[in-house]
Amino acid sequence: MKRSRRTKIVATLGPASDTPEMIEKLFHAGADVFRINMSHLAREKLPERIEVIRTIEREAKRPIGILVDLQGPKLRLGTFVGDAAVLENGQTFVLDSDPTPGDTDRVFLPHPEILSALEPSHGILIDDGKLRLIVTEVSEGRAVTRVEVGGRISNRKGVSLPHTVLPVPAMTEKDRGDLEAGLAAGADWIAVSFVQRPEDVAEVKKVAAGRALVMAKIEKPQALTRLDEIIEISDGIMVARGDLGVEMPLEQVPGVQKRITRVARRLGKPVVVATQMLESMITSPVPTRAEVSDVATAVYEGADAVMLSAESAAGDFPVEAIGTMNRIAEQVERDALYWSILMAQRSEPEPTASDAIAAAAHQIVEALSLRSIMAWTHSGSTVLRLARARPNASVIALTPKRETARRLTMAWGVHPIVTKDASDVDDMAFRAAKFAVRERFAEIGDRVIIVAGVPFGIPGATNMVRIAFVTREHAERA
């Protein structure tokens, strides 16, 4: 199945889309990768959910990516007498280590490590930023605050700390169990929530040990101070605008989105733009004009993928939301301005063999107006370098490793195919041309560019670029 767009679509599964029939509909509507949010799925149900996707994959004969999203450390308040309290602007309010129910003067914060990390002037956001406190005084097991924005506060509401580096590990015990379950069930990508530093990603990568790629979710302002380091150590990046918009001024989020996207592209890492892209489609069959522009902007910026969260997980119109996102991406990619923007954002190749080969392939594509690049790959790294340049040609990844094909479903412009490795140079060229015809990326008389490594079967050995003509024999044997 050939998609007519290069930008990929990630669909979150949930109550509105967890049946085999609905997952299949989402796939045919345009979903390339399915996200499973471990904040809302019981661990024991994960293997079953993944197997449903694999069944659809086998029937469709096209790789489907699976992203398992770890919950990460969730900070929450304790309870209140009467289940709630109302805080007034300007009043004093205390967070402490006393587990008894709170009132209008104080409440339990069941995270002693957070109380010890707070400092005067630090902000505290409660219930997605609906209430805002400023720390005025800190002592052992106690933080005194001034209420800047008050309101009703109820049991176990979430707490965000935009100015505080959280002294908590990257993974909770729940995350560790979910990670092992995801790896055992065959997840292709693992998303790490609330990343603050490169070490958070390194910890997950150490456990994953190559069994899945690791994606860092940028949703804490602290991550921006070490953004390049985090992106370098990660296999992919998600711009998680929801929590970013809570912990930093909303008007700064678009600029941050552009910055993250550009750095990820420069470093050759897939970047996903997420959160509230088509939010109104949770309850409406059509999006707002602003939402259409939001999705289009992410595509124009060159994001590898755009993601739906509640729209596909819990909305009334999950299939329509995927279809809408699909049409927006297709329309943007037909715009000549899209390609001129991508061209203006290209960066110089890194001084590596893979980058040099990718740059040469890109120049040949432009000089000869070729439609497709056929890339033989084991690890997928050269394919990602090809996609990094955003060529005006489809990148067809030919790999003997099914896990590589699935991981590449996240990458811009890549059409992955699982096939046995080439036996020699002639077999490499013939089968590449044959697949180009079979997948409708080329016709008889077209030329295709082939990127490969000799000797075959050795990861990281990409060292050859070749041009092949598509003949009638290729078409007859496709």
From Swiss-Prot:
UniProt binding sites for K(+): 37, 39, 69
UniProt-annotated binding residues for ATP: 37-40, 76, 157
UniProt cross-references to PROSITE patterns, sorted A to Z: PYRUVATE_KINASE
GO molecular function terms noted in the UniProt entry: ATP binding; kinase activity; magnesium ion binding; potassium ion binding; pyruvate kinase activity
EC number assigned by the record: 2.7.1.40
Record site feature (Transition state stabilizer), residues: 217
Pathway: Carbohydrate degradation; glycolysis; pyruvate from D-glyceraldehyde 3-phosphate: step 5/5
Binding site for Mg(2+): 219, 243
Family: Belongs to the pyruvate kinase family.
Subunit-structure text: Homotetramer.
NCBIfam families the record matches: PRK05826.1, PRK06247.1, PRK06354.1, pyruv_kin
Name of the protein described by the UniProt record: Pyruvate kinase
Organism: Methylorubrum extorquens (strain ATCC 14718 / DSM 1338 / JCM 2805 / NCIMB 9133 / AM1)
